[in-house]
């Protein structure tokens, strides 16, 4: 790209993850930019294709001055709706938000990742500028697995026996990426539900596990999304817990020590982590009921009170 005097280039960076390393080239997608003046008055919108986003050298065509830049990815998909005034002439940055596209308040599909960024930038006179623009990933992936405990390997768990869901008030994210909790709650259901076989050294199937995968929008520390697992045959709710409290049960102290925001390390952790693998181990009681004896979250074991079903 030929650079001219006074040109301003924007470079996306996605290092707000648990590896603290830039993964934008792996995640790059279409980017929608909304540009406002220093007071937050709307100036213009730019839509950057995925190919251009991967090149990561976006010419902004801005005059010297101070601007507020708002960015989202994924707005070109069917998963999200950008809410903004039809006539943007007199609109302000606070008028912009993104809503999850949900039918009957239920989301049961593999979502296009939603990335968010907002930054105030000052462009100097007559100088070529490079703007480093950090992004945050709002979309989370949960893999929920139910399997027999090591001492109860004769038991199997067919996937059609369970219903999984996460309920949260995070359908609408404001311009500053906070959830508008006055909205109706969303129920996130699996986009994948299936069985997985575990084999012995000879290759024989020794047990079958249930695996569910689902996505959620951004998790906000201090809110109370619910993770629910229901047994279809009995109709009994096997698990109904505060999801964020469960996540924080694992030994996060070491991870929290790495966080840069010393005042809000829990929120930073939730924003950096975007994949959670939660395994529920069970044994069977003498009457044949399933008893949940322990769970692991991203490899960390959490002991819990027995939950019988």
For each predicted feature, which ranges?
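Single conserved hydrophobic/aromatic residue that forms the stacking wall/gate
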Residues: 1-9
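Loop-centered beta-sheet repeat module
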Residues: 130-154, 160-162
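C-terminal structured domain segments
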Residues: 234-295
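Short, low-hydrophobicity acidic/polar segments
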Residues: 41-138
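Tryptophan-paired
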Residues: 29-83, 155-260, 309
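Short, low-complexity, Pro/Ser/Thr/Gly-rich segments in the mature regions of secreted, periplasmic
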Residues: 296-309
């Amino acid at each position: 790209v030929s650079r001219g005097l006074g040109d301003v280039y924007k470079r996306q960076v996605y290092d707000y993850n648990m590896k603290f390393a830039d993964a934008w080239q792996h995640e790059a997608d279409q980017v929608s930019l909304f540009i406002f003046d220093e007071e937050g008055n709307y100036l213009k919108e730019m839509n950057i294709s995925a190919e251009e986003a991967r090149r990561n050298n976006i010419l902004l065509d801005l005059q010297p001055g101070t601007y507020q830049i708002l960015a989202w990815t994924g707005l070109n998909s069917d998963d999200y709706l950008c809410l903004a005034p039809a006539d943007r002439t007199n609109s302000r940055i606070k008028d912009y938000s993104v809503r999850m596209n949900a039918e009957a308040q239920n989301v049961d599909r593999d979502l296009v990742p939603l990335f968010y960024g907002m930054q105030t930038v000052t462009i100097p006179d007559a100088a070529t500028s490079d703007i480093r623009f950090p992004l945050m990933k709002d979309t989370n992936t949960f893999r929920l697995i139910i399997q027999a405990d090591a001492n109860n390997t004769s038991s199997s768990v067919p996937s059609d026996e369970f219903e999984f869901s996460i309920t949260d008030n995070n359908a609408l994210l404001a311009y500053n990426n906070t959830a508008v909790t006055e909205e109706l709650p969303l129920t996130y259901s699996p986009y994948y539900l299936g069985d997985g076989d575990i084999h012995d050294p000879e290759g024989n199937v020794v047990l079958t596990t249930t695996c569910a995968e689902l996505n959620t929008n951004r998790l906000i520390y201090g809110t109370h999304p619910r993770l629910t697992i229901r047994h279809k045959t009995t109709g009994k709710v096997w698990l109904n817990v505060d999801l964020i409290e469960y996540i924080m049960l694992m030994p996060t102290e070491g991870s929290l020590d790495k966080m840069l925001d010393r005042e809000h390390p829990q929120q930073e952790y939730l924003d950096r982590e975007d994949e959670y693998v939660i395994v529920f181990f069970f044994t069977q009681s003498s009457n044949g009921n399933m008893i949940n004896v322990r769970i692991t979250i991203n490899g960390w074991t959490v002991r819990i009170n027995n939950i019988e079903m």
